[in-house]
């Protein structure tokens, strides 16, 4: 790590901890590397690319769980690799995968923590309750949502543990249902909000407070079911024109027609540049107040392969 004079700590040991007497409070460099929930995009930039950030994030859960040092912090607990669920600085980390476009990894890790690091005995928490946060993580994550950055007003989706839950809110009741839910069917396949197909990997706090129904369809398939928030980041993954699997005038014409109707710039980009790799595909549309397509969601794989 770097010190206050912009120098580098030498020697540096990312596994080391000295309780309340080093650079990290109740943690080490492995845990605090990810503590930028307000600017995940900026953190991604520091890694150099999304792929490199994901690679490092993967390693967090597979490296040794040994905390090195003579007086290590007892708060570094509930370890999976160096992920420390027993202390709050780690609590947002599992949801970074969804923010980085790999929601199945969020689902895997959330289910693992829910089912192995909590139980109904006196020692049922893996760390200090700290004014209720350990329990709050369980409550929110078991509903299938978690507020990664509390000031941002977004609850990111994970993997709901319960088939149905009702939460009393100012606007009435907010109901969350999970169809086909099981230990094996832990991955989100499709989402509906108040009966309409929903294509975001998060829901706003304001929408939760209104009441209504958030419905998940669960399954065993690992998939990206939502539209990426930043489609331009994926543009360089498209194959060159001569490598595309097919080109149909009818398909091109239909895509051009729909793009002319879409008022949302991000969705227009997605529709123009992404196409599912299955013939058995349905596109569901939501409409704006004028009756024009404003949102859509594929029931096939998107964007499992770039065909256009």
For the regions a protein language model found, what residue spans apply to each?
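Beta-rich accessory regions
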Residues: 104, 119, 149-152, 156-241, ...
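Low-complexity, Ser/Thr/Pro/Gly-enriched N-terminal "stalk/linker" regions
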Residues: 241-295
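Short, low-complexity intrinsically disordered segments
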Residues: 6, 28, 200, 223, ...
